[in-house]
A protein has these predicted regions:
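Conserved catalytic core of nucleotide polymerization and phosphodiester-bond processing enzymes
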Residues: 2-156
């Protein structure tokens, strides 16, 4: 952090400590994720897919640190991947059921791209928003938005 922000190490340490003081549940999540990984040898996504971490108990601090970062990140990133895949299947099925000609053509992280017929645009938007926001029920709402354009740049 000190290097990235071009600030003294002591100041970056204060920023990090202040962050975790403000958001203690994040530190608790991180610690718990590492502990679970050390006990089980893996972490899980929201749909129980496993990410095995064979180096989580390594004696090499660099190797272990990499595995610990994966123990923290994999459940979050993997769960996001799980959720978008559920939404994609549901969107595809709705398009089929409703006889739409528009097609899903690309997924990039948390984005979906479609080729949409103009006369189907509003229906496609409604389906996509509904399925993206309701792919799973969480304690916090999933919020989606739609952009449109003749190319990806315009759609953003």
């Amino acid at each position: 952090l000190a290097e990235r922000l071009s600030i003294p190490r002591a100041e970056s340490k204060e920023l990090i400590e202040g962050y975790f003081k403000t958001y203690p549940d994040i530190r608790a999540y991180m610690d718990e994720s590492i502990e679970v990984a050390k006990e089980k040898g893996y972490v899980e996504t929201i749909y129980k897919r496993k990410r095995f971490l064979p180096d989580i108990n390594s004696h090499n601090a660099i190797v272990r640190g990499y595995a610990e970062r994966n123990a923290i990140n994999a459940p979050i990133q993997g769960s996001a991947a799980d959720i978008i895949k559920v939404a994609m299947v549901r969107i595809f099925n709705r398009f089929e059921t409703e006889g739409l000609r528009s097609k899903m053509i690309l997924q990039v992280h948390d984005e979906l791209n479609f080729n949409v017929y103009k006369d189907e645009l509003e229906k496609v938007k409604q389906i996509v928003l509904d399925e993206m926001e309701n792919a799973i029920k969480l304690q916090v709402p999933l919020i989606a938005d739609c952009g449109e354009g003749v190319n990806w740049l315009e759609a953003h």
